[in-house]
């Protein structure tokens, strides 16, 4: 609300200082553009509709307007296309002078609803000005007694451009007496100085003419020149000295023309013409010589032109005192212009609506801007309207206000309002400006319901029970009776694929919202819809709000192992060389979790291993690595069970079974492990059955062979002579005949076990290798025939 002004209890005020940069129905962001100066009128700057994300024709529908400070408009808006154009050619030097960067502020006003958008246009400098010396010829008197190394300041060149386009360097024409030194000043300017290289002789050369060149940094660069006339004078012992090196003075901007500003004073200890002093401006600009003049004899500086604080706040110049012998001294004069309250505030009306519907609170009546070119308290302003009126002044952007209805208007009580807007500054004396407007009230019957919030956010945990109450929306109507009775409804969703009717319902009387079914976070994380509130007036009015439902994740999904596959097919066996170093990467368990957040954070650990301590699992990435060096004593086959666990509450887990085979080299074959299913008990039982069957068949076969040999031996023993044994001539191997009389055989039998991929065992029985003897009692070597084996398979 407004703050009362002293001595004005009948007015309400809003202090602009407190509410600077406060935005109403608009964001605080500023759109910024830049354009080169001197571009033609109508040049394209930007497309506001595109940059602001507005639809085609929305700027025209909302009556978009460009507002600038004061009455000067530099920009224009094409509402249909949204293009922002230059209204006229802009000269950076005229608008900003030596201020860099040069920024022009503007605002865009939108209606329905009212919205302000702050904008900045930066004028970029082009090198359209060349350096310029204020004097075509610079006179410099130098005593012939000056020592080498003495420096003599020269007058600088002026360049209206800024930055790199202003003066960057000076040069002097070639000569044998001087060279040029450029000094960088704290104000950013560069000052040329002549430095004496060798002693001067007036009798040999009484004067010298040089050319001073100033070069800017533009592309292409521009130059300016001035002639330097050096007059060599007789030896002068003393240099003029000012009483102060720097003079400072404050001058009110309303000081009359011709008034004395300040007097500078210097003295010279020489006598005669060498002691006579003459004062003049040394380093100065056009603005200085237009505003001030100096008495060459007395050193008085007087006002030549009326000062204006709003244009120039301070002046800096160098004053030179020269004696008759050519020597000179210099001092600096700083003149600060003091602001006085000589400008009344200005009010610029941007939007005015004369007809306002009754019972329409916060309806915009007018939009206007205020300004005061003064500074300090003289430029601070307060804005107010009369008291006891149902209207409110609301600051929007800096020095922009909106006049709107504060409460319900009743046309039957009062059909017309005369409002006086008063803008007062805080200077001494205070100046003010008044603006009168007339507002007519149009008759209506009711007010639309208004939601307590423009948007609602509801949280529902997944796997909820159907018909769960998830939240409420609420709207109120400023009317009474049936006009204030509000009913709620779900509006058609903007997303045609959202089955809103099967997700939520609303109680039409109280706005309670219910979930119609159990929600699944993995299928639907969030959804939004609009609800409407309609009163029962005639005609009925309604409003709407946005409801956003966020489904909270529950830990209802266990981790799923992607690798190694756990689908009951052939097991995946990892080969590890026995020469592997500790930390050797065996494999990596890859798993995912359908949940989110910490419910999907997975950790890995080794749950079971054939030989604990041989392998390890990294907790965060599932990498299976060797924990130590492998040895020949380590079993060749290993079975690892890796546990994958999420971070939910309660946690869920899954296991992955790995088979590892230790090999001496990757080139040798390996036997797959018999287990395909993770059930260890079933695999152990199958192994027992296979061993028992193998032992039984082997025993039966061995018994049959022994019986056959015994029968043959018995038959031969009958025909053999006493103490003598005979070996048949056929291919029967002699090593199967018991010649020692102990009736035992020395032949060994062996078998292999072949494990097929179908997890069913196959046995391969091998017949002993029978060597061919060269002859009885020869004692020759035997040769193994590997092709004489018989295979027997059992499934």
UniProtKB/Swiss-Prot annotation:
SUPFAM superfamilies: Cadherin-like (SSF49313). Residues 781-795 have a biased composition (Polar residues). It comes from Pan troglodytes. Residues 712-795 are cytoplasmic. It comes from the Eukaryota. Disulfide bonds: none annotated. This is Protocadherin beta-17. Residues 776-795 are annotated as: Disordered.
